[in-house]
């Protein structure tokens, strides 16, 4: 799998993380380089240490941070380029208003977005920016295009895919215990189908309301995680309050955070309700640790210290609400599995957990100033508790800031957070928690659509990078199995995989600051950099290099639609710049990549292998460059 391997110790420049290289602004003398003279790995090492922040591609004395590369519109390619057929089917297929109707007398005219502006919006809202998608956004504008995606139907769900591929029926090989089919399902969901916006935003939700496949054992881990993923997809455009209730009663969440089988107190044994979910629903899923202003900044007491949102007694009391729940086996049938061992059918993995009043605490509950009387029914206690969290002043800014971080920028201004949190509090029609209003506010805000700054942007997550590459280059499975496993290992994988968080705290913390960096000196957040180090840098380049050329297992992208550009280096690199980075690469970086691709010289008589190698190298050089990795 890992030919052309880049060793972290092979070159001193590779020993520095991409973040460090970006912020030091070290000077690299540009020189003529070729795939022949350096090899592909050497080329990538040079590119990743040469294309840096600022407008000069790594100018001497730069004090810019890792976010300092600015968007460039140089060498823009029109949406009608010769590779326009690439990935025609990967984007959303929701219908949209025609340009003529959008510009009618009763509707404001659509702004004349450039292809780069449309691509930038698309790469924040979903995974790809194909020519068809760019044209659609330009035709109707951001909001109308988003509305079409909000109304687009769900195609195949994760559970449906598992069922269709035989992963929901017990087999002699013990498939009902095997979690890897959950990985196959997750990658298939990200790589295929329509409704990219739904899936991109569901991925963001999965890193806020975290459930991980890794600790789930027993019967049907793949179906359990599929049920959770399908829930997020189904409710991503609904209301936060409804979503909060659905995830609280979801079977996978019940297993992950111990509400499954959570019993009421027992005075004889001293048993108390498990407090895990009660803690995490406050700390991570709703209000956070400290009181916030509407703009996401912390409130402070007279001594200037942050004010805690809850104390231990709040957790202990709230835990009583989440007792009496367990998986619902009422529709399950026993089926023969390995050596005829009885296996329950997977109906319990979707829907909600069942409630048993006999196992539910009848004690009074007092938390966050709310009192639930003793002997309140389980359903009513749950309603009061979730309403309390939903209506808390913290919930809007706490949730919205993290969604901005996932989609647009690691360091949103307080004003940006306040505008989005205000949309959470009131969608304009008096409705609180309308997620469509939140997504619309995030993606159309002036801070998202305006010019990038030295502190805007974020590091693209490895999952997002791979999904973008896969969809942009029409990935397919040779046998329909989509056998992509857990890629969380940074040595040979990506250091990240969907629905495989190492803990309930996600792959990275929203407040993470890389220590001993310019980012730390400037007090800038960079959550995704918690995944980034020397090992992950080399691992990413190794993995992507092999994936682009050889695929992974039965899964492989196609460069067929790029082949007409193999002999036109300028058009090739400019096409990649627009569709992969929204013209974010600087002129210096573009020139460096184009120079590298000139040798060996190719003609129409050159072999198909030589032409394809140029295409592989071009893609890799773009997606290995820090100006791509930092999405503006």
Segments (PLM) and residue ranges:
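Amphipathic interfacial helices
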Residues: 181-182, 192-200
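Flexible, low-complexity segments enriched for small/polar residues
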Residues: 119-126, 209, 392-396, 400-429, ...
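N-terminal mature-domain "stem" immediately C-terminal to a signal peptide or N-terminal signal-anchor/transmembrane
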Residues: 107-155
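Short, contiguous, well-structured surface segments enriched in hydrophobic/aromatic residues
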Residues: 195-198, 209-214
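Bacterial Sec-dependent N-terminal signal peptides
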Residues: 1-37, 40-73, 79-82, 90-105
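Active-site substrate-binding loop specific to GH73 endo-beta-N-acetylglucosaminidase modules
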Residues: 43-46, 138-141, 150, 162-168, ...
